[in-house]
């Protein structure tokens, strides 16, 4: 694994959200079966982690969830990602909150890319880690770091948390649902995780 960075604040919110989604008992069982530290079931534990340790824990917890739930993991992780968006908004610094307020006043068509850029700012461990691009009428979010996929090897894309975040952020901004597909994933050997958002008709 490389020395990727991830916010321990987001990691703490992620584990809080997982505990709510699964229930505290099932979360503890999953962590125990995966042979992860049992203290990881207590979100405050992550306050002591540095950004590199947080990135590794984020990947390990999601890997444990995929192993524990098998094919059902996708739905669980998408729901966790969707719930996580509101936590990111609540925890945002003043600049992020101001940007969110501005987005809600923009014309609908202008909100989508601005929202994805706000999400990119929230989840990036460093500047340039997450970028947003226009693809004709559609949009592309590229997570160059993608700590959840770092060191993982899978036949299909695995970044369901990010997918859930994208869907929920766009719904928050526009009141509409969008098709979001992870078209490339680091876990498959790609250099970055790419998410295509179909906005054109």
What are these regions (language model features)?
Residues 171, 177-201:
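C-terminal, beta-strand-rich globular interaction domains
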Residues 143-145:
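Residues forming anionic-ligand binding surfaces in small-molecule and nucleic-acid pockets
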Residues 1-138, 147-157, 186-192, 201:
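N-terminal accessory segment detector
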Residues 160-176:
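Active-site helix/loop of acyl-thioester processing domains in fatty-acid/polyketide metabolism
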Residues 159-163, 198-201:
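Short, low-complexity, polar/charged sequence segments that are solvent-exposed and flexible
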Residues 112-114, 176-179:
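Short Pro/Gly-enriched beta-strand edge/turn motifs at strand-loop
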């Amino acid at each position: 694994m490389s020395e990727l960075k991830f916010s321990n604040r987001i990691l703490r919110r992620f584990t809080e959200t997982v505990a709510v989604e699964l229930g505290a008992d099932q979360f503890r069982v999953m962590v125990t079966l995966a042979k992860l530290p049992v203290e990881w079931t207590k979100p405050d534990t992550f306050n002591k982690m540095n950004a590199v340790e947080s990135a590794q824990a984020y990947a390990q917890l999601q890997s444990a969830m995929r192993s524990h739930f098998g094919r059902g993991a996708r739905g669980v992780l998408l729901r966790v990602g969707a719930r996580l968006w509101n936590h990111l908004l609540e925890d945002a610094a003043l600049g992020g909150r101001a940007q969110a307020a501005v987005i809600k006043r923009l014309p609908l068509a202008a909100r989508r890319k601005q929202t994805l850029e706000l999400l990119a700012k929230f989840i990036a461990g460093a500047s340039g880690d997450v970028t947003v691009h226009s693809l004709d009428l559609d949009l592309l979010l590229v997570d160059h770091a993608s700590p959840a996929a770092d060191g993982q090897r899978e036949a299909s894309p695995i970044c369901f948390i990010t997918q859930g975040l994208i869907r929920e952020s766009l719904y928050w901004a526009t009141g509409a649902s969008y098709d979001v597909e992870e078209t490339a994933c680091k876990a498959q050997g790609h250099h970055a995780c790419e998410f295509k958002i179909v906005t054109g008709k």
